Amino acid sequence: MTTETRSLYSQLPAIDRLLRDSSFLSLRDTYGHTRVVELLRQMLDEAREMIRDSQTLPAWCENWAQEVDARLTKEAQSALRPVINLTGTVLHTNLGRALQAEAAVEAVTKAMRSPVTLEYDLDDAGRGHRDRALAQLLCRITGAEDACIVNNNAAAVLLMLAATASGKEVVVSRGELVEIGGAFRIPDVMRQAGCTLHEVGTTNRTHAKDYRQAVNENTALLMKVHTSNYSIQGFTKAIDEAELVALGKELDVPVVTDLGSGSLVDLSQYGLPKEPMPQELIAAGVSLVSFSGDKLLGGPQAGIIVGKKEMIARLQSHPLKRALRADKMTLAALEATLRLYLHPEALSEKLPTLRLLTRSAEVIQIQAQRLQAPLAAHYGAEFAVQVMPCLSQIGSGSLPVDRLPSAALTFTPHDGRGSHLESLAARWRELPVPVIGRIYDGRLWLDLRCLEDEQRFLEMLLK
């Protein structure tokens, strides 16, 4: 060992001496003596390795307390961190989909802090059913006879098929054999549910006669799947639920629909593209309709099934129902969200998903122009900061071909180097509340459709 190496080793402090320093008192109070000591041992090992490999000390050896604080602060951050979603996708699956209404947040908080009547009947002090209160709300909104709640729509489809068609055939159009994110495929779900898929028609054209010819003594269901994340256009033909229900009645085969995104209001009244609604399918005579709670409905992740009482009863009594049931927090948030639909006049104000989807391009444009000047002054040496029109998307497989006019702040490096864009995006991801945009066409785009806390946004980006 050289004299220089020996000198470097001698500069490493003893853990006991570090812990006696006043700067470590608050760290021990905050993170605990055990964790602070563990980290100091780890850092000493790192320092010894650096001396051995490169004959130098880490820069943080100048201030051990500061480095320990930085590491433990980062370690203590939640894995689920709030972010500012400026990607242009309102219902971003990777960012948690629908924001919850204040009423839903309050309901969840109350449910977490206290015992609740989850499965307890106050009238007779007996055991109640956890879906009962929500079933009544859903029946009121959709016109269904009964309802069932599980933890997401994939679970809803699995339960619906397993409870009503296991060991039998389910007839589906080839054009509706969807795959959604995470390789969730209708044929795979049917196989897991114990059903046999009977494909009919072609990718682009399916007629009533195709369903009729497919029905046999082993047919359990005629199924429609809403193609919420793609669209087949051009030379196409499909039959709607009303026509399929009429055929099902003639052949004595019930019809079920996986609606996917599941809007409970006519979006066209807000200037948005219309999406099929569960209440329309119930009115058409569909026996079971499944849809998501955290997409266009604007609530928590949940799978909702509405339909005929005798069919729902089969779902409720199936063993999978217990495995897939929703917990009290989900039910509390969903109930509070559904109650907002009882007052449609205030829905676009109180439901964040609808509020964000209905923001006008003009309002977003004005916001972008207001933010452009201070950001250009701060970033102008490296980037051209401009206001540009853009198109937002709804996301989560909802209305896949429809776009919403919006406005964005774009950052274009003066030297045209893409690495500068990546570096800027990485810096913003390290902010106390990370700002998430998207890089496209040589620019970093911040679509402002979902920006509501403008002051917090500016404060962070101007530091």
Curated annotation (Swiss-Prot):
NCBIfam families: selA. The gene is selA. One of its GO terms (molecular function) is L-seryl-tRNA(Sec) selenium transferase activity. The keyword Metal-binding does not apply. Its cofactor is pyridoxal 5'-phosphate. Its main location: cytoplasm. One of its GO terms (biological process) is conversion of seryl-tRNAsec to selenocys-tRNAsec. The modification N6-(pyridoxal phosphate)lysine is found at K295. Keywords: Cytoplasm, Protein biosynthesis, Pyridoxal phosphate, Selenium, Transferase. GO terms for cellular component: cytoplasm. Belongs to the SelA family. Pathway: Aminoacyl-tRNA biosynthesis; selenocysteinyl-tRNA(Sec) biosynthesis; selenocysteinyl-tRNA(Sec) from L-seryl-tRNA(Sec) (bacterial route): step 1/1. It comes from Escherichia coli O127:H6 (strain E2348/69 / EPEC). Its EC number is 2.9.1.1. This is L-seryl-tRNA(Sec) selenium transferase. Converts seryl-tRNA(Sec) to selenocysteinyl-tRNA(Sec) required for selenoprotein biosynthesis. Pfam families: Se-cys_synth_N, SelA.
